[in-house]
A protein has these predicted regions:
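Inter-helical turn/loop segments and adjacent helix faces that build the functional surface
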Residues: 51-60, 128, 132
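Active-site alpha-helical segments that house and flank conserved acidic catalytic motifs
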Residues: 61-85
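Divalent-cation-assisted or electrostatically stabilized phosphate/pyrophosphate-binding catalytic cores
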Residues: 5-17, 21-40, 61-64, 86-127
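Residue-level detector of conserved catalytic or cofactor/ligand-binding positions
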Residues: 162-170
Length: 170
């Protein structure tokens, strides 16, 4: 799939290589800033999502921002999940560099930051001019992200997802 996408859109391949190299620099420098550490994945997702937009520059900008928010959340959640392995093997992990020494604390930190990214995403998503399948997209973008971010334990504070956006009637 990667080769096909790269053949169809060489600019995406250049962005992928550039952001991979930037991620390696962040790891080499032991970046402690969460936003800076997540930026390469956010940029990559932003580029991928902007390709899905119409030719309208505002729609393209919104889709880029949506992708960057998803990339930022994905990076942080991934680093929280790999926390124990990274700690055991002495690998780079932004949570370890910030003095977090417990996997559950890393997961909660990632969850809070991912929720902030999703709040940003929801604002950009609300500005999209979706003509078809709005209800389907609402389910994917809102409920799907909720499932990915909100932990399944009963002690967590539930998020009022429907208050984050105004879901339009068909």
């Amino acid at each position: 799939a990667y080769r096909k996408a790269a053949a169809e859109n060489p600019a995406l391949e250049r962005i992928f290589v550039q952001e991979r190299d930037q991620a390696n620099v962040q790891m080499t420098l032991n970046a402690k800033n969460y936003l800076l550490a997540a930026e390469p994945k956010g940029n990559l997702y932003g580029a991928l999502y902007s390709v899905l937009a119409t030719d309208d520059p505002n729609q393209r900008k919104s889709m880029h921002y949506i992708g960057s928010c998803i990339g930022r959340a994905a990076y942080l959640l991934d680093k929280a999940e790999s926390f124990s392995r990274d700690k055991d093997k002495g690998r780079y992990n932004v949570f370890l560099l910030n003095g977090i020494n417990d996997r559950n604390a890393a997961r909660e930190n990632a969850r809070r930051q991912a929720l902030a990214a999703v709040n940003d995403l929801v604002r950009a998503y609300g500005m999209l001019d979706v003509k078809l399948n709005r209800t389907l997209l609402d389910n994917i973008m809102i409920l799907g992200l909720r499932h990915a971010i909100e932990p399944l334990d009963a002690e967590s504070q539930p998020v009022q997802w429907l208050s984050l956006i105004h879901i339009s009637e068909p």
